[in-house]
Swiss-Prot record:
GO terms under biological process: DNA replication
Annotated positions binding Zn(2+): H86, C88, C102, C105
Keywords: Cytoplasm, DNA replication, DNA replication inhibitor, Metal-binding, Zinc
One Pfam family recorded for the sequence: YabA
Name the record gives this protein: Replication initiation control protein YabA
Lineage: Bacteria, Bacillati, Bacillota, Bacilli, Lactobacillales
Gene name in the database record: yabA
Keyword Zinc: yes
GO CC term, one of those recorded: nucleoid
Cofactor stoichiometry and binding remark: Binds 1 zinc ion per subunit.
Length: 113
């Protein structure tokens, strides 16, 4: 092998090494971008989970069912009904005679929920 062939091989290896190094830098840059995006998405995901948790907690507070699975508003209607007044659309506010039962009122209080 003469000196020129040896020099050409070294030059080719050097060029290949530089190409490989450039590809490595490109890959590293792409990896950094992906890792940054991943970190941002994880933070955003965490914030969204916290907001969802707060929204769910607020919703549960607002519709918290108590006695017999009735909400506060239905409990108020139940108290009015127990006091002897109609809470149905037909006779709302009228006094119930002789504590009679009203199917309409009972449907409003205990019906489909």
């Amino acid at each position: 092998m003469d000196k020129k062939d040896l020099f050409d091989q070294i030059t080719e290896v050097t060029r290949n090494t530089e190409d490989l190094l450039n590809k490595l830098h490109e890959t590293q840059s792409a990896m950094v971008e992906i890792m940054e995006e991943n970190a941002e998405l994880q933070i955003e995901n965490q914030h969204l989970r916290e907001r969802l948790k707060q929204a769910t907690a607020a919703e549960n507070e607002g519709t918290k069912n108590t006695k017999y699975g009735l909400s506060k508003s239905l409990q108020n209607l139940e108290k009015l009904y127990a006091s002897g007044y109609h809470v149905c659309n037909e006779f709302y506010g009228k006094h119930r005679q002789d504590e009679e039962e009203c199917a309409f009122c009972l449907t409003v209080i205990y019906g489909d929920r």
